[in-house]
């Protein structure tokens, strides 16, 4: 495998980079191979990983617990599945440095700025930093706000959102498409400005170029009515020309029940008569029934699944805003971290069969074993963390699986289970 070749011959500049590579690099290589990337493209993306992601993982093991994964790891691999195409590999990533969480950089701003600067030098296809700069200006703490938050006690243990920004990388066609993420929680704590107001202000300022305010207003009306905004809400965008980018709003909800999912999918009934929304809801309900998720109110308070077994993870919601679209497009992330991995893989395979995706249905359980050859998936419960689903009229169903993304168990545990 290409990752094995690089492990043997690459001279890593620091011990931390070598340790992170051994923990995340071969696994990344197995994801590339399992998803069907050719050998040339595997090398291409592995080199991108080594040159750009590895130096931004910071000290090993990580001292900063990232908000982007259930275990606090700063990196997450995911696979997207659609009709008549091989899986698409993505990387979610919060850059870290030796200063992250220290008095020099208590809220981890330095590493993100350094990585953005590095990406700007790579001449990535259609890469644009306008929206990244916009949202970091809107949500990142100023010096005075950081000092104010420190006086309030800073980040309170493990129970509060710690991250301010993150990146996503879609690996398709030999290219790297970059996404940005900005979290509103710390700004809310430092300033007292409600999260919904912070997000509304940031989007209103983009209206002359993005023309999505009407769609956002439908979403915001529902969020205000249902008290849906909270410290875990965040914004995402494509790092392309501002007039072509999508915006996505994310958040969590502890009511893991079908009634709440249906309510949120239809924005409290506001878009329930739309044919695409109806079709998507029917498919979503079928996936829900296959996964057999235990219904109830979760006690998620911002901790990490490595500490609580994963059974308290909430639902994640996501609404996409597109230029000229009359309403937001919903996506839901069902928590499966803490559920038996073999059973989850069988449920995913059954759902693929229901969709008529026979190749994906046949290959998925084998793919999971190929990615984690040293794990007995009939015994593990933490390899698959989330399953997301969306539906639109043009491309049909759209399903992604998010995975535990390191070779070693999280935070010094003796086993991944």
From Swiss-Prot:
It catalyses: cyclo(L-tryptophyl-L-alanyl) + dimethylallyl diphosphate = preechinulin + diphosphate. Pathway: Secondary metabolite biosynthesis; Alkaloid biosynthesis. Keywords: Prenyltransferase, Transferase. GO terms for molecular function: prenyltransferase activity. Its EC number is 2.5.1.-. Signal peptide: none annotated. Dimethylallyl diphosphate binds at residues 90, 179, 181, 248, 250, 333, 398, 402. It holds the Pfam family Trp_DMAT. The record marks 92 as: Required for regioselectivity. It is an enzyme of class 2 (transferase). GO terms for biological process: alkaloid metabolic process. Transmembrane segments: none annotated. Prenyltransferase; part of the gene cluster that mediates the biosynthesis of echinulin family alkaloid. The pathway begins with the biosynthesis of the cyclic dipeptide cyclo-L-Trp-L-Ala (cyclo-TA) by the NRPS echPS via condensation of L-alanine and L-tryptophan. The prenyltransferase echPT1 then catalyzes the first prenylation step, a reverse prenylation reaction at C2, to yield preechinulin. Preechinulin is the substrate of the cytochrome P450 monooxygenase echP450 that catalyzes the formation of the double bond between C10 and C11 to produce neoechulin A. Belongs to the tryptophan dimethylallyltransferase family. This is Echinulin prenyltransferase 1. It comes from Aspergillus ruber (strain CBS 135680). The gene is echPT1.
């Amino acid at each position: 495998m290409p990752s094995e070749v690089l492990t043997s011959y690459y001279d890593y500049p620091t011990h931390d980079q070598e340790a992170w590579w051994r923990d995340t690099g071969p696994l990344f290589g197995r994801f590339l191979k399992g998803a069907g990337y050719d050998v040339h493209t595997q090398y291409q993306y592995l080199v991108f990983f080594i040159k750009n992601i590895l130096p931004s993982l910071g000290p090993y093991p990580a001292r900063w617990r990232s908000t982007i994964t259930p275990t606090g790891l700063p990196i997450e691999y995911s696979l997207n599945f659609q009709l008549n195409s091989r899986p698409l590999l993505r990387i979610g990533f919060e850059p870290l440095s030796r200063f992250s969480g220290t008095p020099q950089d208590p809220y981890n701003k330095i590493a993100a700025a350094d990585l953005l600067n590095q990406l700007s030098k790579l001449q990535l296809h259609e890469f644009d930093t306008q929206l990244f700069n916009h949202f970091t200006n809107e949500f990142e703490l100023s010096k005075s706000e950081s000092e104010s938050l420190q006086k309030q006690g800073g980040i309170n243990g493990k129970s509060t959102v710690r991250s301010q920004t993150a990146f996503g990388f879609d690996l398709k066609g030999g290219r790297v498409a970059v996404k940005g993420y900005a979290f509103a929680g710390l700004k809310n704590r430092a300033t007292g400005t409600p999260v919904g107001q912070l997000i509304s202000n940031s989007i209103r300022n983009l209206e002359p170029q993005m023309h999505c305010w009407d769609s956002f207003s439908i979403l915001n009306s529902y969020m205000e009515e249902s008290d849906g905004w909270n410290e875990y809400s965040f914004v995402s965008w494509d790092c392309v020309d501002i007039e072509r980018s999508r915006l996505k709003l994310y958040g969590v909800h502890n009511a893991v029940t079908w009634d709440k999912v249906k309510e949120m999918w239809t924005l409290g009934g506001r878009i329930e008569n739309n044919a695409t929304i109806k079709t998507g809801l029917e498919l979503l309900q079928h996936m829900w029934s296959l996964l057999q998720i235990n219904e109830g109110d979760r006690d998620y308070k911002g901790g990490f699944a490595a500490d609580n077994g994963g059974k308290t993870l909430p639902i994640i919601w996501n609404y996409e805003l597109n230029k000229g679209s009359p309403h937001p497009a919903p996506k839901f992330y069902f928590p499966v971290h803490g559920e038996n991995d073999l059973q989850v893989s069988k449920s995913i395979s059954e759902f693929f069969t229901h969709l008529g995706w026979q190749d994906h249905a046949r290959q998925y359980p084998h793919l999971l074993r190929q990615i984690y050859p040293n794990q007995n998936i009939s015994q593990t419960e933490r390899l698959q963390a989330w399953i997301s689903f969306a539906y639109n009229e043009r491309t049909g169903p759209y399903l992604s699986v998010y995975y535990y993304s390191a070779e070693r168990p999280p935070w010094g545990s003796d086993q991944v289970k």
